[in-house]
Amino acid sequence: MIDREQVRKVALLARLELTPQEEEQFTTQLGSILDYVEQLNELDVSNVPPTARAIDVSNITREDNLQPYADREAILSSAPEQEGEFFKVPKILNAE
């Protein structure tokens, strides 16, 4: 079980200022979380193979292939600004 002093220490390390009410709230919440983790530690998982994910994940996106587009000027003309044959976009990074 976790006590208020441990919550204060964690708050100090995280540079958080907690009110007494928040200290009490987090003491209760963290205590509940740790109790639940303790219940999980009691489970027999010796026959469960290690996994990285609970379900199989597959890539559902298409392969990234270059496709030529015949009307390049139509695309460029729809841009708010262009410079030659390129889109002109606002600068977002400093030159530093």
Curated annotation (Swiss-Prot):
Its EC number is 6.3.5.-. The keyword Nucleotide-binding applies. GO terms for biological process: glutaminyl-tRNAGln biosynthesis via transamidation; regulation of translational fidelity; translation. It holds the Pfam family GatC. InterPro entries: Asp/Glu-ADT_sf_sub_c, GatC. GO terms for molecular function: asparaginyl-tRNA synthase (glutamine-hydrolyzing) activity; ATP binding; glutaminyl-tRNA synthase (glutamine-hydrolyzing) activity. Allows the formation of correctly charged Asn-tRNA(Asn) or Gln-tRNA(Gln) through the transamidation of misacylated Asp-tRNA(Asn) or Glu-tRNA(Gln) in organisms which lack either or both of asparaginyl-tRNA or glutaminyl-tRNA synthetases. The reaction takes place in the presence of glutamine and ATP through an activated phospho-Asp-tRNA(Asn) or phospho-Glu-tRNA(Gln). Belongs to the GatC family. HAMAP family: GatC. This is Aspartyl/glutamyl-tRNA(Asn/Gln) amidotransferase subunit C. It comes from Trichormus variabilis (strain ATCC 29413 / PCC 7937) (Anabaena variabilis).
